[in-house]
Amino acid sequence: MKFNLLNLEGGKSETIDVSDKIMKLKFNHKLIKYVIDWQLNHQKPRTAKTKQRNEVRGSTKKIYAQKGTGQARHASKKAPLFVGGGQAHGPKGAVYKIKKINKKVKKIALAQTLAKKNTDKQLHILSDVKKEFNKTKIFNKFLLNNNLTNALIVSDKNSEKNFVRSARNIKNIKVISDEGANIYDMLKYTNLIITLTSMKKIETRLLDEKN
């Protein structure tokens, strides 16, 4: 599939071919949700953990007889009712995490997300930025002229610093490296802008059957 490249410097538009093996994929909502859940669970490590009554150190002996005292029935002092007892329904730490996910599943999800963005006409490929620039005014004008507000920019290492400097004060714009390309950020923002070098890297990675 052919894409017309956007040009930050305002020169002539070039084209790039991206494999139909990526761009013709159908969007699987269940698969995408599974991968996003995995990603979010690993972004915020849940370290908080409380002891339940079976984990509290102490005797399991009843504190007094079942009958004859005139008081409410109780078991041991490890019950959540007592000070020093276990915590009822408290956080369990890493138990909530999805431990592993297949690499191929992540690749398929990324490819499907790119195809979805293309179908919705929200995928834009940008010519590599050869000159250094760090003015927000120039970059903001480019975004407005191309109606690219609320956008995620996936950049190669050579261009990343320029984008970070020029886009850090623009609302609803985020810059990430192609190595950190992920479906959560891609779906969070309306438009997806990928530099030419980054697109080639991502395409090669997705089509590589060995990894």
Locate each region found by the language model.
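A short, flexible low-complexity segment enriched in Lys/Arg and Gly/Pro that occurs
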Residues: 29-67
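Glycine/serine-rich anion-binding loops at beta->alpha junctions
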Residues: 53-91
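Extended polybasic, low-complexity segments that bind anionic RNA or targeting/receptor surfaces
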Residues: 1-45, 92-211
